[in-house]
Amino acid sequence: MQGAKKPSRRRFILGGLAVTGALVVGWGVTPPRQRLNGSHHLPLSGDGVALNGWVGINKDGTISVAMPRSEMGQGVYTALPMLVAEEMDVPLSAVRVVQAPIDKIFGNIAMLKDGLPFHPDDTGRLKSTVSWVVGKVARELGLIITGGSSSVKDAWEPMREAGATARAMLVAAAAAEWKARAEDCRTENGHVIHADGRQLAYGALAEKAVTAAPGEVRLKSPQEFKLIGHPQPRRDTPSKVNGTAIFGIDARPPGMLYAAVRMSPVIGGKVGSVNSAAVLKMPGVMKVVDYAGVLPEKTGAGAGVAVIAKSFWQARQAALAMEIKWNDGPLAGLSSAAIYADFAAKLDKEEGYAYYKAGDMDAVESKAAGVAKSLKAEYRAPFLAHAAMEPVNCTAQVKDGKVFLWAPTQSPGFAVEVAAKVAGVPAENVVLTVTMLGGGFGRRLDVDMVAQVVAIAKLADGYPVQLIWTREDDTTHDVYRPASLARFSATLDAKGNVLGYDNKSASGAISHQFMQRNLGLPPGGPDKTTAEGEFDMQYHFANQRISHVIVDSAVPLGYWRSVGHSHNAFFKESFIDELAHAAGKDSVAFRRELLAQHPRHLAVLDAAVAKAGAAPDGRAHGVALHQSFGTIVAQVAEVSVEGTEIRVHRVVCAIDCGLAVNPNTIAQQAESGVVFGLSAALFGAVTIKDGKVEQSNFHDYPVVRLNQAPEVETIILPSAAHPEGMGEPAVPPIAPAVANAVFKLTGKRLRSLPLTL
């Protein structure tokens, strides 16, 4: 390794595991845990019986499917049941979802393995060994998490196997009833059908199937799919339209009270003193609590004072009226300018962790003066808030040694653990109901709001309490997408060929903070998210180095939709355009040259460019190509500039996500990702001054409005490859695509987000 620290073998392995939250130290490498049957019963109602840990069946033939992932608009309540319905040969309408119990069989193995810091082209023994170990550890940890665009990817095998096994058990039960061979039976539309025409409905076979020994369990081939790969309507849409869908904020346990909080305006500040005498006389106010005394350390929950009242309005008005003196603490002078200055200083002094290298960059740089052209650029990205439509909320009741919890969470396991920790009860005494989420985007991976509401409910005399943060609370007390500073340098020969490519960036590390807040583990090791999308890109240069410097962050950091890809794609795809311009080449042709060994990437790029066609007069097309979460996305943004206003009219989005389980939700996620990413590209910025977040609501943290949203055209390329992620991959390319179009129109290279002229 030249020009950057070479990681030791041990550090590399442990660092890779650290970013996934799975630390191998102390774990034995045990045989793979069977994912078909767990240690907890599938929660079924009425006459339902469980055929395995994932699938149950009622006498009326309805199928119950365990749902270990949270529905937050990405369509898992449709896509995951499709996997079971396909293998069981039942219509999707016959399947209902039930909340999966906290059990290791539902752990998200794919997300943890995807967090390892290896290049996609790496076929070495270290990668295969570490991936194998992580798979073992992940099975034992059983972390039930919705994130990393991994829901379908992780469920692809276990849920299909659960469905196929259930079908085989039903066939065995029917064969026994008829005293026939299972080989002479087939299944169709919820029935087992014998070759002679006899048939039995699944419901009639349910009880006997429980004890039936399945014969051969065979998964369908793609050629046999009737549901998978065919567009299916979202099953959660009707309830969201008619208002019957239950989100966290809709929880209404009997006798529920409401809580509003005041938290320190300065990051890390504490409560000094509170004068609540007048507040206690206000209408509906039941209690004022400083919950810090019952809140354990390292839960991520912000210190503050809560008002418990009969309505949220009463609680909020009383909270605003409280006289609180704050102890601001050591961060009262913190500013965005100081944070970026610290990044720059660290980049000047430290070599950083080298994620990828090829050739000899030191030799290239030493000869840079003799080459045709040398290029340097510095890019930056700000902190970002999540701004989910449903504000942060959670409902809890602490009574008789138990905790009842209603939570719109992406991390059910963490929610149960922190609730038990705060309440001082065993985890098995926590009863969790996971509601729908009005947007997650990574914010609800953290469980600080769970810790906060349980602490408040512990002081509420047994009443259930619903905690609601206002938009201002949410914006000023988020766990933010890290700010980042990246430096690029490259050398080109007289023919425009890139001789060397170097990228060195600096930012905080999400995993270090997340591990402390949610696992109680000390920070350490590399964090793949800091360099993802850059070190693992598919552009190849003979001499290349990608490194990152972790700078400890006082600002709370959290996972944000597409995580490090959200800024690294902007940096990388913008600089690739700079290289194309410096080489005197068309930006698309330049990319094609670099992707000569990657036909799937080329196909995606070509599909987007062909569909986009020529830009109309007065507009320009900007192009970006990026792979994240296993999915390749190319976007062409059609942009105009009027004065200082950047307007995006149309976006063509081409996708290769492997086998498209439900093309309908894939297209929806592409549209959603474009708009989400465009909001960040044009408007998103959280700034710090005097230790405080300056933004508070949509007036100063705007998102794309309906009249600003572009037309989005989605192309899904056919593929038989393993399904990959789709919840996030459409987010990263939009910012560089727009920036590259602006350069064509104005000749001005925009290297900072949000994009401004």
Task: Please name every model-derived segment.
Residues 2-757:
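Cofactor-binding beta-sheet edge motifs in enzyme active sites
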